[in-house]
């Protein structure tokens, strides 16, 4: 479905009636918070929301990492909240490097490495309250949550994919949009992942940082890859082609193995008869630690 949205397949227009229903419900839901501000929880500490209006992966997590690190460098004490998509937990959960992938979901495992207080909850307002009750933070970053209108926010940042932009421009299910394009005119900043930019968009460029062996934790800089350049490439993210294109630029030869976003891997997914290394994203690696597969490496970006 994601490929159809961004390739602007004509058959999607048969879903237009459902799109009108989805758009009407989304608009009514947002208006209910605008008209009833008492329904909105306002945090005593400022909240920065990093989100998007489209489905299919735009690069929010790297931007959240960057903002958290920059705030820390400048003397602030940031905390994180997220939904913990795909995690099996109840209520509010504090995420640490020891919290398992099964509890948190895949993206939270990446953010857990930041060494800042981090809580997940399907109710982000509750996560933000718990965070402030337990930790001395002076700013909160919400990973996703642009549409979580029950939580007040001081700064809104929308991330878009520079190459795919907003796909066919239609709302779900005929297109990838959670909200209409006009919503972008209301946010404080639009960050464009990869370019080209339009208007006042801020360009974000992601660079490959390190190759890390999943079992041993051994790290190598991008120019010091210790194996030959033939690999099996795996990506279970919102936009697998972004990862595959990066590997091509780095000079790898590989077979493409795309999986759905948040895919739960099994041993068969990672079984190859040859001895070539398996190269995947950091997000995928978080879900594959328990396989103890010595051929798996992952590439970090920053």
Where are these regions (language model features)?
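Phosphate/Mg2+-binding loops and adjacent switch elements
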Residues: 85-199, 210
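A transmembrane-helix-recognition feature enriched in membrane-embedded lipid enzymes
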Residues: 1-46
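Short, flexible loop segments at boundaries between secondary-structure elements
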Residues: 260-264, 295-302
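Residue-level signal for inorganic ion chemistry
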Residues: 21, 61, 111, 143, ...
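C-terminal accessory "lid"/substrate-recognition subdomains
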Residues: 1-8, 165-279
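Walker A (P-loop) phosphate-binding motif
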Residues: 30-97
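Residues in the short beta-alpha loop(s) of Rossmann-like NAD(P)-binding domains
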Residues: 84-86, 237, 302
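Conserved beta-strand elements of the Class I
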Residues: 79-81, 158, 230-234
